[in-house]
């Protein structure tokens, strides 16, 4: 029998190389650590030079505070940092780095040269080290105030790691993405990037709102900026601002999603869940939203020391953060109207949501979301178009489409859709557009119907095409949600209660949220440490698999502190009702009926998409029409 191996300390070199496996995955990982150090040093300009995707050379130069000569060797030691001193400092840390591991890890797998000079030093000093040589060499050098870090031959001494690197272009794309993320996080810093001697981009400082918008356009593309809604909301010590893409600007991959917590780029499942909920019924299946959002909160209530790469965070009150993010984004998307989508880029802004009663995201006494968390203000509260015309329709010629003060019941909203197409009074559909663009509603006036499916309309920008079934489906769907919110959810007691075997933790969760379940029409009773009984379910969900639904909801509550599964099931049912209740294809509409539908779209939330996420209308501008006919060439 062989002798058991003895426990022994790892050599510093091996320990650093093991640590490098967590911190240094590829050149982009090196760039992230070096750039964060530059930002923490107060840099106002950062130059990045790359060769062969960052494998052969990665040089980061900044104009920050610099490092004193005596501290240069220490900067390459493990767990050496200037950013925290005590454990209490970690609870309120605002710097991007604080572990003191990055430079030691990088120097263990590459040839590293660091040159730095402080403002009060007469000369710069340089330190060199290689993976095999853990004793840094310090010598004088020429360098302006600031720091340069040069990393050559990444993974030269760990060939097993090097062979996992991708092609040069792939590695450079990852590295460039890191710089873009940091460029969005710090508008006050200039970033310059060169690859193989060629300038890739030069981003100047962005101090004012217009300059910030330009940088967002440069990083994310001008198309995003033109299809994004600026938002800024602050409440209860939580501050969210940035840009959210309209549902019409979705992507097949989640590659245009930037979320920052106190200036730190994070990818958090709680944030992803809140955003997914907010876009739930306006995105087509398989599409992903786009956003650049900045979330600012007291550092004491967020833990950034969760993962070595610091990509994950943990919030002290995750439920409140989730509900704030969801409610803010849901309201912002709900308040988009056709005139917002036709406005010039950056013209629309949500500074504070309008009061919406039992609206999405409104907080109850204990910070819980109220019952109608996915229902926004009733369209019945906004009669006529808000473009400055008379609500009576006498002067505008299109605003005579009125509604009752009280929201309709579920039965009325689902079955009386024909009443929504009551013709306008004679003479109210103008034969031609008014001369003044101020008098033209966003979706214009109907011209004709195409194949019984599409409405052709003319507005101030050109031609509008509307899918009448999809548009009316959304209108009916929103009314059904409002009706359900006003009536409440009626429960249906089960003749024979269903028993569920759960874990003790799940049973505790269900008991803790019993009031929340009851407001949604469920009645749960705990029969034992690991047994629940379902005694009542929502009447609308009597055909649903109640046992599995309750299990899924409890799993969500344990994971995120909230759940939208019940609401999603209800919305799916309402969506089916709306689909069957909407005007069908091949039904001929009169011009007044078509205009009534257009006016209704202009005051209905999320009218740009049906509840399946398909677009309901599109605009063909005069310039696009001119291109089709080669006019002006």
UniProtKB/Swiss-Prot annotation:
Name by which UniProt lists this protein: DNA mismatch repair protein MutL
Entries under InterPro entries matching the protein: DNA_mismatch_repair_CS, DNA_mismatch_repair_MutL, DNA_mismatch_S5_2-like, HATPase_C_sf, MutL/Mlh/PMS, MutL/Mlh/Pms-like, MutL_C, MutL_C_dimsub
Compositional bias ranges of the Low complexity kind: 388-401
Biological source species: Pseudomonas paraeruginosa (strain DSM 24068 / PA7) (Pseudomonas aeruginosa (strain PA7))
MF (Gene Ontology): ATP binding; ATP hydrolysis activity; ATP-dependent DNA damage sensor activity; mismatched DNA binding
A GO BP entry: mismatch repair
Record-stated family: Belongs to the DNA mismatch repair MutL/HexB family.
Keywords on record: DNA damage, DNA repair
Job description of the protein: This protein is involved in the repair of mismatches in DNA. It is required for dam-dependent methyl-directed DNA mismatch repair. May act as a 'molecular matchmaker', a protein that promotes the formation of a stable complex between two or more DNA-binding proteins in an ATP-dependent manner without itself being part of a final effector complex.
Keyword DNA repair among UniProt keywords: yes
Annotated Gene3D superfamilies: 3.30.230.10, Histidine kinase-like ATPase, C-terminal domain (3.30.565.10), MutL, C-terminal domain, dimerisation subdomain (3.30.1540.20), MutL, C-terminal domain, regulatory subdomain (3.30.1370.100)
UniProt-listed HAMAP family: DNA_mis_repair (MF_00149)
A single GO cellular-component term on record: mismatch repair complex
Residue span of region Disordered: 336-364, 384-405
Top-level taxon of origin: Bacteria
Entry-linked PROSITE patterns: DNA_MISMATCH_REPAIR_1 (PS00058)
